[in-house]
Regions:
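Active-site neighborhoods and metal-handling regions in enzymes and metal-associated proteins
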Residues: 1-211
Length: 211
């Protein structure tokens, strides 16, 4: 969010996305509901947007929030505005709902698994002594992004990535890729992560370089 809060307000009658002016109408284009864009010229315009949706004078008796996404500061501000409302943590309930996928979501995840395989296949082609982690990772990422664009030509493309570590760099599960050159006998860690419309799939494998 780059320091600017984003939110989704759901009432019994409507769903509204709240997004920062820096992203203009992109959040509206990629959502199925209404959108309020706020500027940050004045402090707490995000909160004013929430008030404009649910009202301050006759607020709901209870307000559900995701505590695992809410900072202490934002939680205090919300409670100071809606003093007569009871706040309930619904993060686990929503997580359970997110685990139930539609057929369209399942199709995206299956395509993600297929594309992750293609990325790994491309990486294996480029593994050789003297090649760098960075260049190998770029090859895998580019293959996946092109396949995502082929499969979903009207999507937006962002956050598809590859972790590829070698030798001592494999000691941590989330180590960044480096410009280290592969050496014969290296242990290799291959991770491909295609991101399709916010859904990411992971393929992770351990390999060894024996020239």
């Amino acid at each position: 969010s780059f320091g600017r809060p984003y939110g989704c307000v759901i009432t019994s009658k409507k769903i509204i996305i709240i997004s920062a002016n820096i992203d203009a109408s992109q959040p509206w284009r990629r959502s199925h509901c209404d959108n309020i864009i706020y500027t940050d010229w004045k402090r707490d315009n995000f909160l004013k947007s929430i008030v404009s949706i649910i009202g301050r004078d006759t607020p709901p008796k209870s307000i559900g929030v995701e505590n695992d996404h809410l900072t202490i500061e934002m939680n205090n501000k919300l409670q100071s505005i809606f003093i007569s409302s009871i706040f309930k943590d619904i993060s686990l309930n929503l997580m359970n709902l997110r685990m139930i996928k539609s057929q369209e979501e399942i199709e995206i995840i299956k395509n993600g698994a297929r594309i992750a395989d293609l990325g790994a296949e491309e990486i294996v082609k480029h593994i050789k002594e003297g090649q760098t982690e960075l260049e190998i990772a770029i090859a895998g990422r580019d293959r996946m992004e092109r396949e995502i664009a082929k499969t979903y030509p009207n999507a937006e493309y962002m956050d598809t990535w590859v972790w590829f570590q070698s030798g001592i760099n494999t000691d941590g599960a989330h180590n960044p890729k480096t410009n280290r050159k592969l050496i014969n006998g290296d242990i290799l860690s291959l991770n491909t992560f295609p991101m399709i419309s916010g859904y990411y799939t992971a393929l992770e494998r351990t390999l060894f370089l024996n020239s």
